[in-house]
Each structure stands twice: as C-alpha cells, then as structure tokens.
C-alpha cells in the first residue's frame, strides 16, 4: 500500500503507463511492494533503493470523518526522496502527461516538484497533518484531491453545506490552484 502506490495501482487499472518514484529498503516489505508493482505493470525502474533501509510502513485508523484518528508508521525512508533525487528524475517527470504527488514527501521535495515540473502536478494531501506542508505551494499545483477536513485546513473555510463547500473551493482557487 501507501498513498502513492495505491494511486499508481489505480492508474494501471485504467491502463495508464505508470512509473512510481519511491524509496524502498532492503527488507521483506520492499520485496512485497516490488512484486505487487511488477504484477500490475507499475514501473519501479527509477525507484530509489536504500541499502539497509526499511520500506515505509503505515497502519491507519480513521475517525468518523475519514481523517486520521491514530496511526503507527515508519516513514523515515521518505526523507531520502530529496530534491536532488527528483532533480535526477526530472527528464522522466517532465516527459509524463502529469505528475501525481502525495504529501508523505518532505516539503522541500514537494516544493521542488511544483517548481520544476513542466507538466501538471496533482497532489493528494494524505492527511491534515501532511496537508500543512502544502501552505504556500498551491499556486503551482494543477489539481488537489483533498477530503473535507484537508480542504477546510487549506482553504480556511469550515465546510458545513454546499454553499460553504463552494466558498472553500473558491478560496483554494484564489490561491492559484487550477482544480
């Protein structure tokens, strides 16, 4: 699993050629992720392999609103996905139809991608905690896929009905977001 891997999975189910730029360790979890990606046709040839690293693990319990109530995770390896790593992949990224980013990446990497990718950048905020990283970056993002709580956080608008939902969307668009 993982947000990025799950998005890649769904893109492949739609028949879209998909590269997953991620970091994997040298543990059994890496083997599971690599095998599941191979089975789906997700290209991991540009993934960062971290010797002696632990592939990220995340267990999530959602609240009644669908946001994170409690989670246990080991996401340390995500810190290896630096702007330098993405700079080395920039030709691949800019040759794609779009780049999809999840907010598990370090903020500086998200900022790098939104600044240097010449194709549309789509972002999944992942959670309210991770969505905080996106403040100040939305003007360089094509499409945002927030849930209600993430949209409230990023727009500053409490969403209680259709009218406030539209107001939140307008506030996000006013920050430069395209969708």
Please identify what each model-predicted range represents.
Residues 1-4:
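Short catalytic helix/loop segments, enriched in acidic residues and glycine
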Residues 26-27, 103-107, 125-129:
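Short beta->alpha connector loops
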Residues 72, 98-100, 122, 145:
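Structural motif
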């Amino acid at each position: 699993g993982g947000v990025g891997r799950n998005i890649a999975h769904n893109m492949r189910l739609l028949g879209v050629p998909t590269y997953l730029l991620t970091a994997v360790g040298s543990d059994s979890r890496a083997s599971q992720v690599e095998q599941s990606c191979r089975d789906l046709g997700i290209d991991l040839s540009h993934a960062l392999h971290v010797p002696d690293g632990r592939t990220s693990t995340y267990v999530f319990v959602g609240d009644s609103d669908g946001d994170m109530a409690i989670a246990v995770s080991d996401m340390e390896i995500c810190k290896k996905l630096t702007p330098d790593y993405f700079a080395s992949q920039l030709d691949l990224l800019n040759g794609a139809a779009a780049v999809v980013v999840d907010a598990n990446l370090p903020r500086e990497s998200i900022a790098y991608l939104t600044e240097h990718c010449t194709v549309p950048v789509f972002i999944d905020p992942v959670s309210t905690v991770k969505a905080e990283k996106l403040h100040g970056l939305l003007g360089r993002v094509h499409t945002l896929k927030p849930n209600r709580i993430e949209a409230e956080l990023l727009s500053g608008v409490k969403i209680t009905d259709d009218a406030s939902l539209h107001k939140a969307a307008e506030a996000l668009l006013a920050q430069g977001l395209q969708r």
